[in-house]
Amino acid sequence: VRLARVAAAGEVFWALLAPDLRHLQRIREPFSVWAPALGQAGKACLGLDDEFLALSACRLLPPLEPGARAFGVGLNYRSHLERLGSAAPAHPLAYLKPDSALVGADDEIAYPAMTEQLDYEVELVAVLARPLGDEPRAASCVLGYTVGNDISARDAGRRIARLDLLTQKAMDRTTPVGPWIVTPEELGVEGQPELDMRLKVNGQLRQQDNSREMIFPVDELLNYLDARISLRPGDLVFTGSTHGVGLEDGRFLMPGDRVEAHIDGLGTLGNRIGPRRVLSPARERGRLGRPAGE
């Protein structure tokens, strides 16, 4: 099945997409009830409305349950590392994203004032159905998968000559995710799916790969994160991006660019880059950090 979080008629709710992908039914049961049960109980646990709504009358939101977290993982595709001249890490490089960084399908991506090198990253995103238990495969706790675009400020931290993941990965309204969640059953897989992915900027192909090429597969990523921060139902885990990003060749995003991240079986996540944000000159000190020696 396909599950979306939508806004319609002044309300926000989870919904089940119809097979035609043009209509949906509202889910009445709480996420905490149906998410852990869906894999076994099927649609019977959703408490669906009889009425079908037109998808065109709804706004697609990031598929994030309130209170859930979004985790990111970097440096997880060998082809990307090879183009950067870097060796594969011994363990995942992970970070947290605030929910304020997320936007949905067709939402505008903010162009932050803190960067001049805004980059794109198509990513497979796992959504948790329940906490990890004693299952031999952590991916059995996944509700489904969606598409992410981990927009990054590549020049973040350059002034202070240090890694600055807060600026690079967490700024307001810079991370599209969606358009909906697709369950493993719908994909016909157990464990990690092997899906072709690609990203286009203004119709030009920039990234293309398959999720089988991850260095650390979903099982290992979930185990790594859960050993440090216990994963909860609804948590999103971005699993890293492949080669073809602007960091490799200097082709960064500009205001007005249209970015489309696509993963076969999941859908297309399209967004436009908004105007560059301008900050007030007040409180400028400390905004960019201090150069070495100051």
Where are these regions (language model features)?
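N-terminal non-catalytic cap/leader segment that marks the start of a structured domain
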Residues: 1-92, 258-260, 279-282, 286-294
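Catalytic-pocket segment enriched in acidic/His residues
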Residues: 10, 53, 80, 154-294
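Non-heme Fe(II) oxygenase catalytic core, chiefly the N-lobe of the double-stranded beta-helix
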Residues: 105-143, 147-154
